[in-house]
UniProtKB/Swiss-Prot annotation:
Pfam families: NifU_N. This is Iron sulfur cluster assembly protein 1, mitochondrial. Residues 160-179 are annotated as: Disordered. InterPro entries: ISCU, NIF_FeS_clus_asmbl_NifU_N.
Length: 179
C-alpha cells in the first residue's frame, strides 16, 4: 500500500513550488526575477545632485538636449562657464528616464563642475558606467550623459562665436579708411 504522503512527494507539480501558494501561473513567472542597482546608482537616483535649470539665453550657458529613442530617456544638461578661464562654474540637469539615466546625469554634473570645457568633452561614457557599475543593458544611459556634455559645450561655443564677431578683411580695411 502506498501512503498519501509518498504520492504528494511523487507528484512533480507539488515539488516545484512547495512553499508557495499553488496558483495557475506560467512556469516562467514561478520565480520572481529581481534586478538590483548598485548603491552608487541608488544614491544618485534617490539624492540627485545639481537638478534644475540655468537661463538658456545667457551667453555663458550652454545647453545640451539628447534622447534615446529606444528607451525614451531624455536628458538636458546645462553648463555655465567662466568666460575668462573656460572653467565650468555651475551645471544643472533634468532627466526624464530610468534610474540609471538619472544617476548618470547626476554623477556627470559632479564630475564636470570645476573642469575646463576641454577636459569635460574628454569624459567618456565608460568612465561613468564604471563608476556607477552599470550593467551592459544600461550602457546607453552613460552614452546619453557623454552626448549631453558634448552638446552643451557645442552650444556654449556657438554662442561665444556669435557674441564676439570678428572683423573680416574688408571690414577692417573700411574701418581704417574711415578713420
Amino acid at each position: 500500500m502506498i501512503s498519501r504522503s509518498f504520492l504528494r512527494l511523487a507528484n512533480p507539480a507539488r515539488r516545484a513550488m512547495p512553499a508557495v501558494k499553488r496558483v495557475n501561473m506560467m512556469p516562467s513567472m514561478a520565480l520572481p526575477t529581481k534586478r538590483l542597482y548598485h548603491e552608487k546608482v541608488l544614491d544618485h537616483y534617490s539624492n540627485p545632485r545639481n537638478v534644475g535649470t540655468l537661463n538658456k539665453l545667457d551667453v555663458d550657458v550652454g545647453t545640451g538636449l539628447v534622447g534615446a529613442p529606444a528607451c525614451g530617456d531624455v536628458m538636458r544638461l546645462q553648463i555655465q562657464v567662466d568666460d575668462e578661464t573656460g572653467v565650468i562654474k555651475d551645471v544643472k540637469f533634468k532627466t526624464f528616464g530610468c534610474g540609471s539615466a538619472i544617476a548618470s546625469s547626476s554623477y556627470l554634473t559632479e564630475l564636470v563642475k570645476g573642469k575646463t570645457i576641454e577636459e569635460a568633452v574628454k569624459i567618456k561614457n565608460t568612465a561613468i558606467a564604471k563608476e556607477l557599475s552599470l550593467p551592459p543593458v544600461k550602457l546607453h544611459c552613460s552614452m546619453l550623459a557623454e552626448d549631453a556634455i558634448k552638446s552643451a559645450v557645442k552650444d556654449y561655443r556657438s554662442k561665444r562665436s556669435v557674441k564676439q564677431p570678428t572683423l573680416g578683411p574688408e571690414a577692417a580695411q573700411a574701418e581704417t579708411i574711415a578713420t
